Amino acid sequence: MNQVDYLRISLVDRCNFRCQYCMPEQAKLEFLAQSEVLTGDEILTLVRDVFLPLGFTRFRLTGGEPLVRPDVVEIVGKIAALPQVQDLSMTTNAYLLTELAEDLYAAGLRRINISLDSLIPAVFDQIVGTQGRTRWQQVWEGIQAAYRVGFDPLKLNVVVIPGVNDQEVPDLAALSLDRHWHIRFIEFMPIGNAHLFHHKGWIPSEELRQRIRDRWGLTEGYVRGNGPADVFQIPGAKGTLGFISQMSECFCDRCNRVRLSADGWLRPCLLNETGQIDLKTGLRDNVPIEELRERVRQLLLLKPEINYKGRDSGTAGAEYHRTMSQIGG
């Protein structure tokens, strides 16, 4: 088991998209009231006084969509200023990134992952939900803005949905040819989208690699980061390709992260709804910080047993009742 030193912090459960795999339009969601969401100061307290003393050095801000939170730049600046923080990154849909990229970079953010599930605007809108207007062009402009500002590495996340965008995999891989972009293909997961998952299933990463291999060739590669991706490269390309195979190639033994939801629940495993602890209530009830730190330490000791290992079938096993946006992907 790897040392657990990586915390993913969900800043908000809301999003300006309704992606099929994260916040399906069919899902009847009850969003958190503002009073239920961790404040910026509470997040800073947990990072500084609970997680850093336990050996956490790497942090990623997620959602929902983190950029819809008004104080996102301030939160980035406060965490980035902590001397023990070795790496601070963010996952975003980039819809608001054009106007925020420079401020985020100036605040100390250096790495960013952007969701880009299709190069075809109509398919992209089918996946993310239009809410009355197309979204692709503004996302593409946000990606370009992040590239100009200097985020490095700049990673593009592609959730591969059979029959929807899987035919685009070679074209998406080609984005790595002429730019230092890192394209990551993620197997479709059964998180709050059972109606889609049972119908469509998932495509193993090895099959995706073979499609790229047939068109471009493929060699092993490397890119800086904290994730479980297996990294490859098209020969001669400036960027790389990553494959996150949580369904077909279990990587529980390599897991180095825990997740903090927007309402303060610490979750040791994305695919297991047991073993969570409520840190927000402890903070607001003035539980001594040493006690909160000990609760987290004890949870980390249990993490190897909590990690979900039943990925033999996409339709077998537990039902996942919370959406990815509620968990904090």
Swiss-Prot record:
Keyword match rRNA processing: no
GO BP annotations listed: Mo-molybdopterin cofactor biosynthetic process
Keywords: 4Fe-4S, GTP-binding, Iron, Iron-sulfur, Lyase, Metal-binding, Molybdenum cofactor biosynthesis, Nucleotide-binding, S-adenosyl-L-methionine
Database matches in InterPro entries: Aldolase_TIM (IPR013785), Elp3/MiaA/NifB-like_rSAM (IPR006638), MoaA (IPR013483), MoaA_NifB_PqqE_Fe-S-bd_CS (IPR000385), MoaA_twitch (IPR010505), MoCo_biosynth_MoaA/MoaC (IPR050105), rSAM (IPR007197)
Co-factor binding details: Binds 2 [4Fe-4S] clusters. Binds 1 [4Fe-4S] cluster coordinated with 3 cysteines and an exchangeable S-adenosyl-L-methionine and 1 [4Fe-4S] cluster coordinated with 3 cysteines and the GTP-derived substrate.
GO MF entries: 4 iron, 4 sulfur cluster binding; cyclic pyranopterin monophosphate synthase activity; GTP 3',8'-cyclase activity; GTP binding; metal ion binding; S-adenosyl-L-methionine binding
Pathway entry: Cofactor biosynthesis; molybdopterin biosynthesis
Cofactor(s) listed in the protein's UniProt record: [4Fe-4S] cluster
Keyword Iron among UniProt keywords: yes
Residues holding S-adenosyl-L-methionine: 21, 64, 115, 189
TM spans (from-to): none
Domain spans labelled Radical SAM core: 1-229
Reactions mediated catalytically: GTP + AH2 + S-adenosyl-L-methionine = (8S)-3',8-cyclo-7,8-dihydroguanosine 5'-triphosphate + 5'-deoxyadenosine + L-methionine + A + H(+)
Residue sites binding [4Fe-4S] cluster 2 per the record: 252, 255, 269
One Pfam family named in its UniProt record: Mob_synth_C
Binding residues for GTP: 8, 60, 91, 155, 257-259
E.C. number(s) listed in UniProt: 4.1.99.22
Sequence similarity: Belongs to the radical SAM superfamily. MoaA family.
UniProt cross-references to HAMAP family, sorted A to Z: MoaA_B (MF_01225_B)
Record note on quaternary structure: Monomer and homodimer.
Stated role: Catalyzes the cyclization of GTP to (8S)-3',8-cyclo-7,8-dihydroguanosine 5'-triphosphate.
Name of the protein described by the UniProt record: GTP 3',8-cyclase
Organism: Cyanothece sp. (strain PCC 7425 / ATCC 29141)
GN (gene name): moaA
